[in-house]
Structure formats: C-alpha cells, structure tokens
C-alpha cells in the first residue's frame, strides 16, 4: 500500500515537473554541486529501491518497519522531484551519444544484494567507465562549453547550421581539436566540468596567437590584408577566442532553455529518463514506440528485442523496474537523442519517412546513416519501425531547395530555388503553427490526441519539422472526404481522408501524382497541402516537362479539368497546363487565333508581336501580363498552324522558359470591339497597321538617303546590312537583386580605400594590388552605394591590363548594373575610360542585346550615350540597334530623347546621322501620332538641314490624310511641316489636293470624313484655309468644297463648324 502511494506520488511529481513551464529565474548550473547531488541521490535511491518486493524478488531492506518505509518513501519522492528538476534544467545540454553500458556492466549494476555500499562502488565504476568511453570514442558529438548559452543573433561566432558549437573555419576540415571542446553528458558531471575548464583555458591561450598577425609593410598591404571587402556574418577570426568570450556570456546568463524542446512531447518519467507516451494508431507493440514499463529497451533509438504494450499506463510503473539501475536509466534515457525531429544538433541530415511512428526512434545513428542508406545504418528496420524505402534524400546543411509559389508560372510549372536554411534559437518553432496545450489529452499524461500528422517524405535539414495538420484533424475519429468545392489557401482546405495516418494523393494541375512523388517535392515550411478529390471518370494525364512537377500555384488553377486520354495525347495543345481561363478559351480545331503561355514577366506586347511577326502576319495582340500569356490573331489559319508547329515548346525569348502555344477560340464581336484599341505594336493610337520592319523599308531608306544628297553609299549599306542581321535582342534585363550577392559589404574598409586613393596616399601599384585582390567582388561592388565609387577610382588609376581583368568580371552584368541607381555611375565610368579596342569590343558584345531596353530606361540610356565616344566603327552597334528597333526605341519616353541626344553628339559620323534622319522620315506618320515620337519629328524638321525634308514628309502624310487631319498630334505636325517652307506652296497645295481627291481609293470623300469628325477635323480645315503657304487657286477650291459639305450636314451646332462656315462665306 505504501509502495503504491509512493509510486503515485513519484508519478504525480514527475508529471508536474514535466508539464509545468520552466522558471526563467533558475540560477546557472554549478557542475561541482551537480556532481555532489548526483552522488547523494545515488546512495539514497539505492537505499530506497530496496523497500518492498519487486516481482517476487527479496531485498536486504525488506525487514524495515512501516515508519522507516514511510520515511524512505517521503525521502525518495523528494529526491526524485529534485532529480527531475535538476535534469530538466540541464535537458538542452544533453547531446546524443551512442556510448552506453555493456551487458556485463548492466548485469553487475542490477545486482541489489550488495547493499548501498556496493551500489555506490558500482556507480563510481560505471561513471569512470563511461568517462573513459566518452574520451576514447572518436564518433562522439562534442561542443564548446562557450556556446551552450543562448547567444545573440549578431554574434560573429553564431552559426545557424551548428547552433551550439563554435563556428568552424571555411578553410578547415570542419573538425576541432579536443582541447578546445567539452563533452556534455549526464554520466559524469564532474568530468564535464573539468573538460569545460580546460577548454576555456585552452581557448584563452589560443586567442592571442590566432589574432596576432604580422604588421603590413605598406599602406596597401594594410588595406588588402583582408582580401575580401565583404563581411561574412558567420565567419569568425578565431574560434577559440570567440569560444572564450561566449563562455563568459554563458556564465552570466540565468535564463534556462527548458522550453526549447521540440514539438513532440517528452514526458519525464519516474525512471529519470525522457519517456514518450504511445503514438501508435492503432496501438502497436513495436519497440520503436517508447516503452512505458520503464525499461531502457525502447528509449529513443536504442533498439532491443524487448517490447512492451503501448497501452501500459504510468500507474503500473514501479520506481525501479527489474534489472534496471539508475545509471543504466540515465545512460539509456537522459543521454539519448532528445529531439529526433527538430532539436538542433551537429548532424547535417535527418532521416525522414512518411510513417509518423518512426519519429521517436530516430537516433543519431539513424540520422547519420541516412546519408548512406538504411542498409549501412546498422539498425534493424523491424525493431525501429522505420522501413528502408522511407528515407528521404538529404541536402547540405546550409541550403535546401524549396517550392516558391511566387515563382510559379501561370500555367502551373513548379519553380524551385535555393534558400539558406535558418535554424538555432531564432528559428520559428512549431508552437507558432498552433500546437499548444489543447492538443494534449489530459487523461493520458501528455500524449497527443491522435497521430494524424501527414509527414511527407521531403527534403529537409536537421531543423526541419513536419507540417502540422489543421486543428480539426487531430481527432481520433476518421474524417470523411471533403467536398469537391475549392476553398481558400488555408490549413482547413486540406483534404481529410478516411485513413487518418496515410498521406493522400493530390491533384497537381490536372494530373494525379502518387503519394511518393508528392511527398518528395519540397515545400515551404508550414505551407498547406492543397489536395483535391479526383473523380474516377477522369483519366489521368502526365506531362513531361524536364522532370519538373506540375502543381497548381493558385486555387483557381486547380479547377482546370482534365481531358480524356485521347485528347491528352495531343502535345501541341498542352492540355494540362494553362491559366484560369485557358480551358474555356483554347480548343483543338485550328483557328487563326493562338494562345501563348509561359511568357517572361515584364515582356511587352511590342516584343511579343515582333517576335511572332517573323513567322507570319499578326493582325492583333492582347496581353495578359498577370497571367504571363497573350492572345495573338493571325491573318489566316495556315499562318497560325505554321507558328504553332515552329515555336511550340521552344525558347523564343532570351533567358526564359519554353513557351506553350495552343489554338484559341475566336473572340466574339463584343470582345473584339472592346479590344479594338489594342491593335498591333502601336498602343498609343487605334486602327494603325503594324510598323514595318527594317527589311521591309530597306529600299525606302536608301531612296531617302539619296534624296538627302548622299552619293557614297558604301558605309550606308554596311550599317544597314549589319542592322538587318540583328535578331538576338533580350526581352528583359535581369534584376540586379537576383545577381547581386546578399553578403553585407564592409563599408568602413571601402571608405578607407576611397579616402586613401583620393588623397594620393596609394601608388598605382598599390591600387592595382587592391583591384587584383578584389576581382571576385568587383561586380557586386559596382552596384553598391559605396562600392561603385571605389570601382570608379580603380578604373581611373589602374593600367589597361588590370582594367581588362576587372572588365571581364563586370561586362556580363554591365547592362543590369547600368540600370541600377548606384551602378549606373560605375557603368558610365567603365565605358568612359575604355581605351583599347579589346575593352570596347567586350563592352559592345555584352551591351548590344540590351540596347533597346537600355534606351528605354531612365539610367541605362546614359550608358548607351557614353558608348558613342568609342567612335566609328566601334560605336556602330548603337546605330545598328536603333535602326533595327527604331519604333520600339522612338516611342518610349527616354528612348526618343536619347536618340535625339545621339544626333547632337559630336562623336557621330555623318553616315550614322543621315541614316537616323532617314528612319525618322520613313516612320514619320507613326511618330506624328505618338507623343514621344513627335519630338524626333520636330527635331528633324527644325534642326536638320537636309534638302527636301518638308516635301518628303508631306508625301508620306497625305497617304493617310484622314487619320492625320483628325489626330490631335498629327495634324499639328502637318501644319508645322507646311509652315517650314517659307514662300513655297508645294507642301500646302499637295495637302489640299489629297483632301479634294475623290479618286483616292483609300480615302474616298476625305473632306466629308474630316468634317464629320468634329473634334479636330473642322479645326484643321479652318487653319489650313487661313495658312499663307497655300496658293489662291487651291484655297478657293477648298472653300467651295467645304460649303457644299456643310450644306448637307444637319447638325452644325459646334463652334468649330460655325467658325469654318464664317471663313468660307
């Protein structure tokens, strides 16, 4: 009876100490006092365990009276509570160890007939034996005593991949000398304390030697003593020095870390070990589960042949189980792997499986063996409950590949990128995902209500935790399948299958992926699994896209219905990918409309239409920028079929993924009218045909150049032919944030270098030494707010060979540096100081694909203008790009002004200037209807003195006289052209003839159309009648025609028509 009371008290005390929150005011540990407490408890407990009979065995102390037994029970309970608190405060100092007591030693320790003295001697023997094994075992996990305390996140010695150990040097082998490390174990606290003090002394001795460096002989050597101008936050100059400083910081702290255990609950049982309640569902007898009987056979990765029922309650546990001693319990429990799932330790990988029951049995040996497979781990899968095929492949400890939904394309291709894994104290623990005390069953002593976690077999690091299910799925009752209605991207939208402990398949963009494929795909931490029930009437279809899985990136994309197997065989239609509306807009029957998907982000309608116009005539285009797709209408069905066969699944844009093309349904008349304004490349005005390409206007350009009075056309032909051959223009310039390193630059060192160079304290040789030592960082420095000034100084003072070395590193990124607010200054300086032909050719090679985009950028256009100083023929690549993409450049805000600046530059030859003037003349009608293009047209008329400019422009304007006269910008340009020819009425008379020409097939009854457009038409006719550069005969003809048209008009209420009637009266 007293024994049962003692057992209940012990259990209640252990449970109370385990579940209660730790106090933050606990004093720091004193290893010497800890050793004394252990010795006293060993003696007292050895005396206490002898009271009563254990399974029929007899103890020497069985003749004690009831009062003695009561005192022993009370003393034992008090000591057990002290031990619980003691080990609980030191739980995070416990590290995984595979060293334990051998079988003979266990048997010797389990002999109770030797009395208290024998027990003490055996304990001493076991402690010394364990200490010797710890010191002789080369596979022991060791950590510096300095880093056991909670360190600051800005500490230079903090390493997320090795949270409680010192930072390992990047050039070392990753191993540290045992003299600077201490062993953390619960076997012998005194030995741990001794090693810790030795470690501190060793680190203090090593610190001066490691930090002492030779004084540089010169100023430059002092500057470049640290060759890298980049600060690595995870690097430390001296591991031992930092270890010693952190030891002081660890001693001063009084904050305990008992609440930093992983999410899986650990119950501190009466055997002074960490027990885990049964997780099995249904209950199993596998030794992979914790043995509730108190035996050491099933504690955390120590597999034996002994198993116990998972349903054993804690009330049946005796204070000391048969054949179990305190030392053995400590060896098998307290020093075992406390956190097989999420506790930070030095192992670079962790074994994962889809079976949740294996988690408590994941020992250090299992984690280490996952690198080489289960066959080499030395652990029997039948004992641990971990099947060999459930091991996930591991990745490096510093980075992991994960799914980024922000990079997912509109039609469902999964994108991956790498991200440094953060771990340690600042890592978000699973408590943030909603796991709290409500998840524990109060009647089972801290066990979870149901193990319905869907632990996917995925990539993970040592601190990766499985995704938690919604709170509603933690019931032991099986859940029915959810309805097919799509819900928001929340945890409650997860599919609850009838089997609560088996992962369910998910619908991935119209194709079924089995559970193994799904579980192997990496996902963001805490991201929900968007599963969808699949109807059996739908057949599965798979699409091979270079081993990239298909995943619905948005809920609406998952609604794309799958097609039949016969339809899925058509690879040209890409049936299983697309945006939210592609299912309703695409079809298999050939049409003159095409849907183009997987377009690069930021691509313009101009670029898309120009690219596809090379394969056929494009009549219109409609962009869906938010869906990364577009709809193109061609002139015929045959053209659309030809484009689909030629370009489907190919990379047609520089640096982008293959495009997806399929036939689209022809839009209705209502949708056509709503998009009539978006017609071709010109988005500034409606009903305008596509601007012709350079090849189409090649002969026209030559004729205009000849009209300007040029006879020698050899150089003209050379530039035009080279411009026609250009086809590799980029669709976009990569963002500097993707190429720029995330490392923090050393601002003080950069300021020091710049100041010394500005003050003349460094010779040219010293400056070149700095440049050579910083070659690997010069590209990143060019875009930094301080680094770009240093790069400019380096290019100013270095010789040509050194500048070429730096330029080889910078030139591939020169375009993206040039459009950066800081990098544009460095890019302009690099281009400006280029003096050799090799440097100029290298710059031209890497800038030419980006010339149109640089012209349209507020910073990049200055980089292009700086290239003009190269002189001909080195700067011909700029004018070749202008001629090839003239309309794209001229219609942009910065491009039109940059072209005008190029025409004014003294570094431009006459051949280059006349070619640009001829291009302005040929594209004059399109430029007149664009606000930015009007600037170039005005510059040509007012500032360029080539002959016959007014008459050449007028002849082109009268070809589309109605649109020119009714456009708010174009008609002003036409009046300016007429006014430029002083005393010459040829241009004005030509315009009047075009308006009155009834034989014009393109614009019959032009005057009526102009007057009926009452916004700008009547105003233009009124100004034309009062213009002085029109002959009298043509003026009278126009007045007579206007009176006749006004007589037929019923509505003449506008002010412009009234004014026009007064002029013609």
From Swiss-Prot:
Pumilio repeat positions: 771-808, 809-844, 846-884, 886-917, 919-954, 956-993
What is this protein's name?
Pumilio domain-containing protein P35G2.14
Assign the protein's first listed, main location to one coarse class.
cytoplasm
Q: Which Pfam families match?
A: PUF, RRM_1
Protein's organism? Schizosaccharomyces pombe (strain 972 / ATCC 24843)
Q: Which UniProt keywords apply?
A: Cytoplasm, Phosphoprotein, Repeat, RNA-binding
Record keyword Repeat present: yes
The chain positions of domain PUM-HD read 712-1065
High-level lineage: Eukaryota, Fungi, Dikarya, Ascomycota, Taphrinomycotina
Determine if Cytoplasm is one of this entry's keywords. Answer: yes
Q: Which residues carry this modification: Phosphothreonine?
A: 260, 554
């Amino acid at each position: 009876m007293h024994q049962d009371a003692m057992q209940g008290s012990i259990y209640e005390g252990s449970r109370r100490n385990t579940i209660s929150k730790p106090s933050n005011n606990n004093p720091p540990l004193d290893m010497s006092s800890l050793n004394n407490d252990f010795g006293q408890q060993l003696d007292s407990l050895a005396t206490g365990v002898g009271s009563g009979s254990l399974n029929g065995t007899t103890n020497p102390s069985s003749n004690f009276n009831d009062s003695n037994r009561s005192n022993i029970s009370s003393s034992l309970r008090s000591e057990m509570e002290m031990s619980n608190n003691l080990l609980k405060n030191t739980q995070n100092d416990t590290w995984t160890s595979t060293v334990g007591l051998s079988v003979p030693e266990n048997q010797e320790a389990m002999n109770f007939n030797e009395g208290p003295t024998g027990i003490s001697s055996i304990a001493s023997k076991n402690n010394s034996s364990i200490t010797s094994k710890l010191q002789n075992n080369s596979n022991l996990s060791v950590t510096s005593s300095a880093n056991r305390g909670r360190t600051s996140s800005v500490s230079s010695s903090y390493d997320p991949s090795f949270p409680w150990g010192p930072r390992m040097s990047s050039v070392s082998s990753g191993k540290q000398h045992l003299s600077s490390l201490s062993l953390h174990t619960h076997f012998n606290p005194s030995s741990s304390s001794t090693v810790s003090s030795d470690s501190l002394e060793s680190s203090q001795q090593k610190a001066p030697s490691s930090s002492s460096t030779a004084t540089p002989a010169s100023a430059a050597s002092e500057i470049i003593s640290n060759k890298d101008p980049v600060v690595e936050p995870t690097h430390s100059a001296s591991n031992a020095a930092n270890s010693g400083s952190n030891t002081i910081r660890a001693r001063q702290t009084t904050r305990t870390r008992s609440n930093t255990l992983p999410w899986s609950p650990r119950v501190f049982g009466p055997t002074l070990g960490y027990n885990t309640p049964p997780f099995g569902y249904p209950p199993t007898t596998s030794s992979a589960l914790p043995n509730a009987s108190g035996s050491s056979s099933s504690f955390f990765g120590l597999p034996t042949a002994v198993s116990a029922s998972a349903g054993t309650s804690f009330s049946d546990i005796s204070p000391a189980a048969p054949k179990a001693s305190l030392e053995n319990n400590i060896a098998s429990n307290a020093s075992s792997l406390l956190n097989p799932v999420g506790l930070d330790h030095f192992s670079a990988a962790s074994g994962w499986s889809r079976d949740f029951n294996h988690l408590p049995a994941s020992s250090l040996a299992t984690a280490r063996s996952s690198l080489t497979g289960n066959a080499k781990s030395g652990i029997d899968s039948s004992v641990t409950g971990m099947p060999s095929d459930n091991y996930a492949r591991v990745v490096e400890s510093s980075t992991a590949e994960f799914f980024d939904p922000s990079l997912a394309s509109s039609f469902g291709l999964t994108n991956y990128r790498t991200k440094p894994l953060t771990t340690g104290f600042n890592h978000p623990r699973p408590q943030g995902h909603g796991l709290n005390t409500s998840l524990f069953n109060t009647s089972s002593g801290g066990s979870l209500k149901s193990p319905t976690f869907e632990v996917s077999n995925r990539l993970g690091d040592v601190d990766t935790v499985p995704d938690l299910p919604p709170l509603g799925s933690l019931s032991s009752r099986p859940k029915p399948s959810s309805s097919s209605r799509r819900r928001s991207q929340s945890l409650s939208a997860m599919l609850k299958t009838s089997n609560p402990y088996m992962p369910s398949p998910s619908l991935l963009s119209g194709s079924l992926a089995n559970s193994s494929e799904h579980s192997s795909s990496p996902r963001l931490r805490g991201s929900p699994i968007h599963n969808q029930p699949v109807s059996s009437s739908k057949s599965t279809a798979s699409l091979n896209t270079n081993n990239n899985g298909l995943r619905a990136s948005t809920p609406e994309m998952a609604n794309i219905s799958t097609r039949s197997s016969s339809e899925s065989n058509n690879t040209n239609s890409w049936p299983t990918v697309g945006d939210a509306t592609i299912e309703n807009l695409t079809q298999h029957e050939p049409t003159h409309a095409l849907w183009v998907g997987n377009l690069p982000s930021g691509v313009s309608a101009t670029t898309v239409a120009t690219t596809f116009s090379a394969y056929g005539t494009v009549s219109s285009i409609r962009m869906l920028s938010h869906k990364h797709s577009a709809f193109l209408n061609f002139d015929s069905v045959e053209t659309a079929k030809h484009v689909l066969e030629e370009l489907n699944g190919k990379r047609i844009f520089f640096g982008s993924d293959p495009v997806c093309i399929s036939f689209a349904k022809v839009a209705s008349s209502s949708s056509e009218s709503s998009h009539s304004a978006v017609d071709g490349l010109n988005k500034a005005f409606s009903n305008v045909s596509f601007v012709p390409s350079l090849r189409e206007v090649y002969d026209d350009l030559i004729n205009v150049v000849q009209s300007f009075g040029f006879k020698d056309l050899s150089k003209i032909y050379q530039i035009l032919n080279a411009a026609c051959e250009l086809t590799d223009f980029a669709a976009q310039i990569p963002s500097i944030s993707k190429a720029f390193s995330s490392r923090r630059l050393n601002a003080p060192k950069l300021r020091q270098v710049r100041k010394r160079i500005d003050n003349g304290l460094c010779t040219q040789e010293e400056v070149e030494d700095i440049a050579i030592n910083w070659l690997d960082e010069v590209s990143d420095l060019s875009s930094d707010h301080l680094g770009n000034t240093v790069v400019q100084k380096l290019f100013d003072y270095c010789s040509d060979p050194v500048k070429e070395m730096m330029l080889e590193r910078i030139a591939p990124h020169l375009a993206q540096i040039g459009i950066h607010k800081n990098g544009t200054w460095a890019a302009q300086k690099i281009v400006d100081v280029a003096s050799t032909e090799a440097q100029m050719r290298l710059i031209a090679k890497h800038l030419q694909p980006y010339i149109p985009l640089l012209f349209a950028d507020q910073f990049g256009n200055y980089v292009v203008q700086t290239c003009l100083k190269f002189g001909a023929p080195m700067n011909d690549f700029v004018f070749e790009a202008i001629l090839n993409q003239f309309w794209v450049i001229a219609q942009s805000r910065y491009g039109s002004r940059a072209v005008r600046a190029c025409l004014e530059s003294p570094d431009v030859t006459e051949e280059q200037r006349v070619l640009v003037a001829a291009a302005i003349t040929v594209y004059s009608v399109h430029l007149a209807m664009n606000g930015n293009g009007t600037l170039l047209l005005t510059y040509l008329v007012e500032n360029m003195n080539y002959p016959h400019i007014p008459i050449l422009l007028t002849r082109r304007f009268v070809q589309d006289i109605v649109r020119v006269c009714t456009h708010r910008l174009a008609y002003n340009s036409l009046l300016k052209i007429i006014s430029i020819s002083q005393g010459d009425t040829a241009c004005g008379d030509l315009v009047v003839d075009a308006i009155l020409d009834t034989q014009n097939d393109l614009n019959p009854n032009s005057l009526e159309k102009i007057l009926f457009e009452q916004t700008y038409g009547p105003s233009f006719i009124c100004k034309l009648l009062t213009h002085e550069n029109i002959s009298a005969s043509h003026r009278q003809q126009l007045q007579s025609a206007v009176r006749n048209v006004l007589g037929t008009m019923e509505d003449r209420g506008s002010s412009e028509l009234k004014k026009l009637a007064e002029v013609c009266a």
